[in-house]
Amino acid sequence: MFVAALNIFGYTMREFVVDGGICLVAVGVGVVANVIGYQIMRRAAGDASIPKLADGLVAGLVGLLCFLLGLTLNDARENYIRAIQSATEEALQCRLMYQDFSVLAKLNDGEKSAKAQSLAVEYVQNVIDHEWPQLGESTPRLNEKAGILLTQMRLALNPTGGTFLSTRTWTGLGIVEHLRESRLRFAMEQSPSGFWIIIATLLAMSCALMGSVAPTKMRLVLIATFCLGIGIVCLLIDEYEKPYGGWIAIDAQSIFLPSEMSEAIAPK
């Protein structure tokens, strides 16, 4: 029942375990660092300046930590929004090509244009069924067949024929190819592992400096709550950096399937 409830929100058990692990690691790092920090700092209990100095350093480190996370979250969200805009533009170009191929099939060279129209439908279906899931993998990649379909559509066109539609469709194919490469770039724009090591180090240092006072149960609960909040921000960054996978992934079907093309794709 729990797994079914997760699926309702587009959340798999694997994603739940990974995201939960991020939060648990953040809490564990903070609590352990606080206990260790107390063991170290109590040796200087006779120096009254230590707690004041520690409080000042904590404020600075927490401020730096929040600044880095806020900056990264903003960049990740902007990348996510650009991925949506790119997919929307690609879907628009696919719809225009589909419509233009339909008109060209009635005007001249009907067999080739009709073939190109069916290739456009096959390309959209391939993007939804194969390329989108591949972009959501740990190592994002484009689907080879989708590239072949675009090449076949080019071969079916005659851009020197003099018609406005054939020229526009040829240009549209170039735009689709460019946007398709952009999708791969959006999928690969992720924070390096070194960044997360720095974040974990700053979190541990902040919590260790909070150890100037004995770690009572209530203090540990408060520190764990703070670390949990940091962990939630980290997993939100992680989700935004995966625009084609995860529980906030862009829905390819809703973007790429307008009514006139959805009718051409047989339901599975």
Regions found by a protein language model. Give the residues of each.
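Residue-level detector of alpha-helix boundaries and kinks
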Residues: E78-N79, G161, T225
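Transmembrane signal-anchor/signal-peptide helices with a preference for the extracytoplasmic
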Residues: F67-T88, E241-Y244
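Alpha-helical transmembrane segments of integral membrane proteins
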Residues: G21, V58-L65, T225
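Structured inter-helical modules in multipass membrane proteins
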Residues: R82-I84, E89, R95-F186
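Residues within alpha-helical transmembrane segments of multi-pass membrane proteins, especially transporters
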Residues: V32, L61, L65-L68, T72, ...
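Hydrophobic alpha-helical segments
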Residues: M1-T12
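Alpha-helical transmembrane anchor segments
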Residues: G10-A44, L53, L184-K268
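Loop-to-helix transition at the N-terminal end of transmembrane alpha-helices
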Residues: D47-L61
